[in-house]
């Protein structure tokens, strides 16, 4: 079941995000020393509270048997676009369709928020993840290299269909 995140969910969401993105960090050799701004290391209670209360981001958690095992948020952008952030599922609950449910829910929520397009950023070198998003209709739009990351940031987008 997917529910909107409340303040009392924040700490658990931080744990879910950090645990989920840690597998990516491990796979690509990312550490707090070489990629301190990477999601697995940079997500904090204060940051998520700012997202929720400062930026008013819609944030959602996936509950499985009463515990949070997945998460995503939407950052509303100009021109009726939004950015999908931190869509994740903890490793023990992967390959059960939860990620797909979260993504489809994100599309639904973005549409309800009058977004015409959803943008995402990924670790470009993560070919499996890129292919997964492409399977849902995302199109690769470019890359950018930042000095503070040892990987390349890849960008993708999907236009939402009118209903």
Regions found by a protein language model. Name each.
Residues 116-130, 134-136, 143-163:
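C-terminal "cap" of GNAT-fold acetyltransferases
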